[in-house]
């Protein structure tokens, strides 16, 4: 009680959920409904009263990166801690990481995971970079045996061999650009630029389109239509060139079919 978490939705929802479990007040600073970019002035103002500000960068599911100038302003304004979750950070362009600010912002934490770029989602392993006193405080409340030895061994190999993953990440970046550009050309689809390994799109009857992608094409995408601020939005993960080509063709066909069906129904 008495603590405040500042959240920037639409974003990864678990932080707000666990804050509520801990009886922490959640203040939502909503993103622009058209661009999904943060309202910078409102965010800095809210940060002045915050115990913790959480920024996901690249943001899930919108894909935008928090500008370093904004992160610095939030750190300067916030009397508490500022957490930048960079779970998808390896897919962003070089120079986007908030790690560059750690030396000047002693209330900044940068969170990473091996679940995304390193394909170790099942290992449930990540790490945080922060000032020594912040790390000591986190260590004091860390669950006992929080990372088992098998996960530690797998994580060590992944980090030591990180260059082996670089070609895969580079291909995902290139395919992300191709996927975004192709989706943007489909009539009836809006796509947002992304620095993650996914692209967010909006189309009419998104939930039905998602079901038809699954049932008729065996293609799975994430339906965010239920989430506040994300009406009719789908998140499409970047796959192989062949998979991306298949989803582009399937989505174009289904969106056209749904539009024709809606027009036919209107004329009946």
Where are these regions (language model features)?
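PLP-dependent aminotransferase-like
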Residues: 1-55
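Short beta-strands and strand-loop turn motifs
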Residues: 26-30, 52-58, 82-86, 192-194
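PLP-dependent enzyme catalytic core of the Aspartate aminotransferase-like
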Residues: 69, 215-216, 226-268
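Short, conserved active-site loop motifs that form the nucleotide-linked donor/cofactor pocket
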Residues: 80, 107-108, 189, 219, ...
């Amino acid at each position: 009680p008495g603590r405040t978490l500042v959240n920037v939705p639409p974003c990864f929802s678990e932080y707000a959920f666990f804050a509520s479990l801990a009886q922490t007040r959640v203040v939502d600073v909503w993103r622009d409904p058209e661009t999904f970019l943060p309202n910078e002035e409102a965010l800095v103002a809210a940060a002045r009263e915050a115990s913790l500000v959480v920024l996901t960068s690249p943001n899930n599911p919108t894909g935008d990166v928090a500008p370093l100038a904004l992160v610095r302003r939030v750190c300067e304004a916030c009397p508490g801690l500022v957490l930048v979750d960079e779970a998808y950070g390896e897919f962003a362009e070089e120079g986007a990481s908030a790690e560059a600010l750690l030396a000047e912002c002693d209330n900044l934490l940068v969170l990473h995971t091996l679940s995304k770029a390193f394909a170790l989602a099942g290992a449930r392993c990540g790490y945080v970079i922060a000032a020594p006193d912040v790390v000591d405080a986190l260590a004091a409340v860390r669950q006992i045996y929080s990372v088992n030895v098998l996960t530690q061994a797998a994580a060590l190999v992944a980090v030591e061999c990180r260059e082996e993953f670089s070609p895969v990440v580079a291909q995902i970046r290139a395919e992300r650009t191709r996927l975004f550009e192709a989706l943007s050309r489909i009539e009836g689809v809006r796509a947002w630029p992304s620095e993650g390994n996914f692209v967010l799109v909006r189309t009419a009857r998104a939930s039905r389109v998602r079901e038809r992608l699954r049932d008729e094409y065996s293609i799975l995408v994430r339906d965010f239509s239920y989430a506040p601020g994300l009406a009719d939005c789908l998140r499409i993960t970047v796959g192989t060139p062949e998979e991306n080509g298949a989803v582009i063709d399937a989505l174009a066909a289904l969106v056209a079919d749904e539009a024709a069906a809606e027009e036919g129904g209107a004329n009946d």
